[in-house]
Amino acid sequence: FTRNGPFAGRDDERLEDIQRATDDPEVRAVLCSRGGYGMSRIVDRIDLRALKRNPKWYVGYSDITSLHLWLNKVCGIASLHAEMPLNYSDPACSPQYYETMVRALRGDAVPVTWTPPREASFVVSGVVTGGNISLIYSLNGTPAQPDTGGAILFIEEIGEQFYHLDRMLTSMRMTGM
């Protein structure tokens, strides 16, 4: 892999890689090996015409959120916010994560259950949108800003200070997100 400062190559190199995978009709899924900052720098330059004719899965999380939201809002294409190959060998990443991802990629229903930290007596359902809160926040006001009306907004973040999270959530609330 090439490097360019904090990036996995120059913007044009990374754009060429994602474009090649997007255009190739033999590629049925793109598994991002890691999050890595920089997708938001190129996401609006990806030519999505081939993808609209031949949809495929894009899988990843963290900074890949910008790609997920762009695909969803601009193309109406679903993607999968899921574990990346870099983490498959991590003992904290159970085989269940991988198996569930494969089921989702095959089109099988994958129910999501969650035990809230306190007792709750309600059931929710709806379209799920979201991802890394820093990326959601940075895409506010762009064509990739998620539609949250009637949706279940999920957010993830690692190591962010509470006051940063509060600032982002407050801004998102004030802008109607």
Question: What positions do the PLM features span?
Answer:
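Short, acidic/small-residue loops that bind anionic groups at enzyme active sites
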Residues: 46-70, 78-85
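Internal helical hairpin/lid segments
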Residues: 144-177
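N-terminal glycine-rich "phosphate-gripper" loop used for MgATP/nucleotide binding
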Residues: 31-40, 45
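Short glycine/serine/threonine-rich phosphate/pyrophosphate-binding segments
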Residues: 37-40, 64-68, 164
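ATP/NTP phosphate-donor binding region
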Residues: 1-26
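Conserved anion/nucleotide-ligand pocket segment
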Residues: 76-141
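Structural motif
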Residues: 29-31, 59, 152-154
